[in-house]
């Protein structure tokens, strides 16, 4: 059983390695988690000793197979909880992230699988991010950033890169949601 802090680090490393050009550097991890670089370095050494990451000072951190499996499991739990909160408890998409951050640390695989079944096995969370399946497979879809469209192009909103509450509220105020045609 991993601590909440360990789970948060693994999730951050996974996300950074999949979204940021330079990958999960000490500074990038610290920035994402709101933690000082020296504290991050200490935790990275611990994660390396647990064989969850491959850590080499001044290089981007890579997850081991075990670390990646844990990270994907955490992301699966988080995104399923977001779907539950939006679809079943009527939270708006800008309210669910922080609540899901707390719920994601419940480790019962039986609970997560039942939640998945209860929600009819959703493929994407309320922000358009893919939900890993029970085997840890992430089914991504082709997406194009809005900035790459040219005037006159039509597109359907399938996800948002910025899932901050303020940005999601801005989109709501503009009546832009997932599935909205532009």
Report each predicted region and the residues it spans.
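N-terminal helix-turn-helix DNA-binding core of bacterial DNA-binding proteins
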Residues: 4-35
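Charge-rich, N-proximal long alpha-helical rod segments
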Residues: 23, 41, 55-57
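Short, hydrophobic-biased segments on the C-terminal half of alpha helices
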Residues: 44-45
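A short, conserved structural fragment
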Residues: 48-56
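Basic, amphipathic "hinge/linker" alpha-helix immediately C-terminal to the N-terminal HTH DNA-binding motif
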Residues: 59-78
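All-alpha effector-binding/dimerization core of bacterial HTH-type transcriptional repressors
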Residues: 77-92, 98, 102-110
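Mid-protein regulatory/catalytic core that forms ligand/cofactor-binding pockets
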Residues: 104-182
